[in-house]
Amino acid sequence: VTGLLDLFGLAESAQLLSLSPPGWGGNLLRGLANSLQIALGAFGMGLIIGLFGAYGKLYGGPILRDLLAIYTTVIRAVPELVLILILYYVGTDLINKVASSFGYGRVEISGIVAGIWVLGIVQGAYATEVLRGAIKAVPPGQIEAARSYGMPPFMTMRRVTIPAMMSFATPGLANLWLIATKDTALLAIVGFAELTLETRQAASSTRAYFTFFLAAGALYLMVTLCSSVIFGWIERWARRGQPSLRERRQ
């Protein structure tokens, strides 16, 4: 194997990417694990915000709808890098000011928690619109039938609306998940050790920029391909019992 790598000039790259020192492969995998942790947390937080935000926009009062409209408009209008800087530093300062007002010392916020908080707020705005559109796509007769049976709003949401809207929401949510995995790279600007920052540090230390950034791109691509398979399975599961597009045309 070593001779084959030497033949193609890949021996040095393989050594740099090895999992044990002096290779940096272990650092890249740790960065990938941190990126996935933040992406999963932010995606989950965004789903919760989005679900309640969508219901608030559709069924809430005028004040609530206006506040949610401001939230989704501002988040979608401002570049995500600027939002990350604002939410990270302003949020940290606010928490420390509140803590000091109660007589506590400076609070050290975990990088993972801060990353989930920042990206979760961003994800929530987009998820609100995705889920709002999915809820509006549910045939009104299904929700009216649930109400006629005396189901309370929460039970109607849990047993009728959410299952019915899943087939409409899954493609948009899949895109949001992929955006979340890529947006973790923006956290490198605040010094969080995710995949992009680990890649930059490895490349700067070895001057092998092409090798490490190509490896990072391959890891991001692997996450995307695996995610596409998983969300494809979820979409097929959500559409079970429904006619396919070809059957509808016939």
Task: List each language-model region with its residue ranges.
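Transmembrane alpha-helices and adjacent helix-loop boundaries
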Residues: 1-250
